[in-house]
Curated annotation (Swiss-Prot):
Sugar-modified residues: N127, N158
Binding site for heme b 2: H450, H516
Binding site for heme b 1: H409, H480
The name this protein goes by in its record: Putative ferric-chelate reductase 1 homolog
Cofactor details (free text): Binds 2 heme b groups non-covalently.
Known cofactor(s): heme b
Subcellular location: Membrane
Residue ranges occupied by any Cytochrome b561 domain in the UniProt entry: 372-570
Organism this protein belongs to: Drosophila melanogaster (Fruit fly)
Keyword Ribosomal protein: no
InterPro entries listed in its UniProt record: Cyt_b561/ferric_Rdtase_TM, DOMON_domain, Ferric-chelate_Red/DefProt, Reeler_dom, Reeler_sf
Recorded family membership: Belongs to the FRRS1 family.
PANTHER family: CYTOCHROME B561/FERRIC REDUCTASE TRANSMEMBRANE (PTHR45828), FERRIC-CHELATE REDUCTASE 1 HOMOLOG-RELATED (PTHR45828:SF38)
Occurrences of domain Reelin (ranges): 25-195
Length: 647
């Protein structure tokens, strides 16, 4: 009898052990029936009795919502996916929580038709959380979530996602979703209210701090992004000085807490920005800058890191570690882009090290209205670098870098080589037989004007050359600078050569005339070519269509030369016909003497068609002033797109 009992006991133990092994979860799988309601508060899996801890690395999974704004009582699509797409996971748990205290669970999830979603009742409410109904591998989960009818404010979806039994991430957040009145979806969000359903005590370790993006009916002065500027955080935006007036077209805010570097970036209202970005630069010039871009795509704001290139302008994302920055918060409300980003203290990009703890950097704020494939477009809305490099941890008032010297350099060179040089050459070539007998400062009119215009060219060129050296503080070699240097050298040679001009009857005078003509025209041509090359310089920020204005000027200038040349030939023919009217051999001595006296008198008179030359000179002068004015305005107001966009 005792032996039979012992045998039954042994069999019972064996069966129990076998059953235990059969139902014991596979270490490579999540819990087959989903998360229990005992973890509603923590969302922390109790795998292997709690001995398996959540991963502390960046989650390879994301929580995406179909919209960043939702009306009360409306339905929202929520997607759980891997990054990159196709990465599978086994289990999950998700719930939406109020961004503001008390961080209670908000809304309800809808059941799946195929039964793949298990709904949970947390905090004495129904279906306000969801988990998996089976632990099989899945690449995407699509859920439907309905907002309460009595809640206004922002919610964040938090998820726990398990790739395997031993690998899971807790607190994977979505971007904030703004719950607004259903009948007034564009109205400003009211102070956050709790829904009527009772709320238990909850924790919120993974819910980002509160930030409500501004909208077009909230006063600019109430925008919280400006709070603490210059006191607890660095703020910089454009146009220059906009932080003080709280009216920035784009702004970045830098907050440093130990080794934590947070950047807030926001576009302005009514700018129609396609992106907003901030760069870290050693020299305040475009090129080799670490850039953080916030780009709205498919109803959500995405974060990208890139390295800029100066010529041609580009912001390249390849070979830049996209995990060097993490998106903590983002929204787009009424066209205003906002994101809050945490960057690593040290980032290595293509052999360059950006050390935010020890380095000093210029802040470059930029925004534009267009995107390229895998890149942002040109910053036509605006761009501004800070005047001085700063240690990001040192809070201070920042001002924009001045472009005055660059603008003066460009304006002086345009006035010199498009304006005064063009007119000076016209006087020297076509007006030696005009205003004959009239003098200024003891010299013929044509020479007085030619000398005045060329001295002005020399003065403007020297001043512009000095200004750009003061700005750059170093030699920069590219087509614009090399051809420009040759032009400056020729500009110096011309007046020096003029000091050694041979006399009118000197046998060397023709050689001087040809050399002076060649040097002057070569300098003029190279000066205009140099201006063409300036259009492509990123620091100039000139529009590409400025090339067509320059081409138009060249066409007009060549056409004027052609008309003057034809007029000159007609004048010479007229004089020749008058001289050949009588044959000298048929004249008496008295007649020949009278003829010579008549020709001598003609030399003291203007050549034929002087009125035409004067009239054409007046028209050309007016057109030249218009060209110079337009080109200087493009330089001084660069980038001109920001003004054209406001008109």
């Amino acid at each position: 009898m005792m032996q039979a009992l012992t045998m039954r006991s042994w069999l019972a133990t064996l069966v129990t052990a076998l059953l235990a092994v059969a139902i014991w979860p596979d270490p490579g799988q999540s819990l087959p029936q989903g998360a229990p309601e005992t973890v509603c508060d923590t969302m922390l899996p109790f795998h292997s009795g709690g001995s398996v801890l959540p991963q502390n690395s960046v989650s390879p999974f994301s929580v995406e919502t179909s919209s960043s704004t939702l009306g009360q009582g409306q339905t929202l699509r929520v997607d759980l996916t891997g990054v990159p797409a196709g990465l599978s996971f086994g289990g999950y748990m998700i719930q939406a929580r109020n961004r503001n205290p008390p961080h209670q669970i908000i809304g309800q999830f809808g059941p799946a038709r195929d039964g793949t979603i298990k709904l949970m009742n947390c905090e004495n409410s129904v279906n306000n959380s969801a988990t998996h109904s089976n632990a099989g591998p899945k690449q995407q989960v699509i859920l439907e979530w309905q907002s309460p009818v009595d809640f206004l404010g922002q919610v964040v979806f938090n998820a726990t996602i398990a790739q395997s039994y031993n690998e899971f991430w807790v607190g994977v957040p979505s971007q904030p979703v703004q719950i607004v009145r259903r009948d007034l979806s564009a109205a400003p969000p009211l102070p956050t209210q709790s829904p009527s359903a009772p709320a238990g005590t909850t924790r919120a370790p993974y819910v980002p701090p509160s930030y409500v993006a501004p909208n077009n009916v909230v006063a600019v002065s109430s925008d919280p992004i400006y709070n603490g500027c210059g006191q607890s955080k660095n703020c910089f935006g454009f146009p220059d000085g906009c932080v003080a007036t709280k009216s920035c077209t784009s702004i970045t805010v830098v907050t440093v807490r130990g080794d934590v570097f947070e950047f807030e970036i926001q576009s302005g209202k009514g700018t129609n920005a396609a992106y907003v970005a901030v760069g870290l630069s050693d020299d305040a010039k475009m090129g080799d800058d670490l850039t953080t871009e916030c780009v709205p795509e498919n109803g959500r704001v995405n974060l990208y890191s890139s390295l800029t290139s100066a010529s041609p302008y580009s912001a390249v994302r390849s070979n830049v570690n996209q995990n060097s920055a993490r998106l903590l918060d983002a929204s787009i409300v009424d066209g205003v882009i906002y994101c809050r980003v945490q960057r690593d203290a040290v980032t290595n990009v293509q052999g360059r090290t950006f050390d935010l703890r020890n380095g000093k950097y210029h802040l470059l704020v930029a925004s534009g209205s267009s995107l390229k494939e895998n890149s942002v477009g040109y910053h036509d809305i605006g761009r501004l670098p800070s005047a001085q490099p700063i240690n990001l941890a040192e809070v201070q008032d920042l001002s924009g870098s001045s472009r005055l010297l660059i603008q003066l350099h460009g304006a002086f060179m345009i006035a010199a080589w498009i304006g005064t040089t063009s007119l000076g050459i016209i006087f020297a070539r076509y007006f030696k037989q005009t205003w004959v007998g009239s003098q200024s400062c003891g010299t013929d009119q044509w020479f007085a004007w030619h000398r005045l215009l060329m001295v002005t060219t020399w003065s403007l060129t020297v001043a512009a050359y000095v200004l750009i050296w003061v700005e750059l503080k170093q030699a920069v070699w590219h087509a614009h600078s090399i051809i420009g240097l040759i032009t400056v050298i020729l500009c110096f040679i011309q007046p020096i050569g003029a000091l050694f001009r041979p006399g009118p009857n000197d046998k060397k005078r023709p050689y001087f005339n040809w050399g002076h003509w060649l040097g002057g025209n070569l300098a003029h041509i190279l000066g205009i070519v140099t201006i063409f090359f300036s259009v492509k310089l990123p620091k100039a920020e000139l529009p590409e269509w400025m090339d067509w204005i320059l081409v138009s000027f060249v066409v007009v200038h060549v056409l004027v030369h052609l008309i003057f040349s034809i007029g000159g030939m007609a004048s010479e023919r007229h004089l020749s016909q008058r001289a050949n009217t009588f044959q000298m051999g048929d004249m008496s001595h008295h007649q020949q003497h009278a003829m010579r006296n008549g020709m001598s008198m003609e030399r003291k008179m203007d050549a034929p068609y002087a009125g035409m030359r004067k009239g054409l000179l007046g028209v050309y002068g007016v057109v030249l002033i218009l060209f110079v004015t337009v080109l200087i305005l493009l330089v001084v107001l660069a980038p001109i797109e920001q003004f054209l966009g406001k008109s």
